[in-house]
Amino acid sequence: MGRTGHCVVFIDLHTLFGIGDRRPGRATQKIQPLELAPGVWQMGLITFMLLGSFMIAFTSNAVNLTDGLDGLAGGTLLIAAFAMMVLTWISASQRASYFLMVPYVPGSGELMVIAGAMAGACLGFLWFNVAPAQIFMGDTGSLAMGGLLATIAVCVRQEALLVLIGGVFYLEALSVIMQVGWFKFTRIRFGEGRRILLCAPAHHHFQQAGWKETQVVGRFYLIAITLAIVALVSLKLR
């Protein structure tokens, strides 16, 4: 995301938490719906804003990098959105959040509607996006959907589980970072750039290794489903 994107993320968080609004009761009214249950550790507001901004920006770009094969980004987003819908329901329920020892976030049940709408949109989109694709998500769709997914996770205080739920996206992004970083390092160190993968992002590496496009997409779906299940099951295993 460019400078404008980061400004938008900061403004959203600024508005969400009422920073700078010193009218009596105003800031409290904005923060109160997102406060955690007593006894739950909270990081400082500035740290939280920096972490939240980073998570939203990084996830947005990670989804954008994943959108390289027909049906890949749409399907993995569908899985992640469904898992996030479950998390928002748990966070909104005082009994469920206490039982599973996750932060209780009053009012977060409204986000379940957004996560459900996101999953439904991905499902309808995927019908026309599977190979051979008739429509494409593009940068506008992938950046927005990735940012929305991360925003929901930040609002319900599940940034850590987002790393599992969106594991495919982060692996794709890390593959690009590692490939570019290693290439630049070896070019400076040895005078010749070297690569870790055959091609980046990771889905193109497997294509170069001989996998068919449908094989890559299908297996990434399986990985995404597995990670989503592990993330949800881990709530009970704490």
Language-model segments: residues:
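A short, charged helix-loop
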Residues: 30-41
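Alpha-helical transmembrane segments
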Residues: 1-20, 29, 44-238
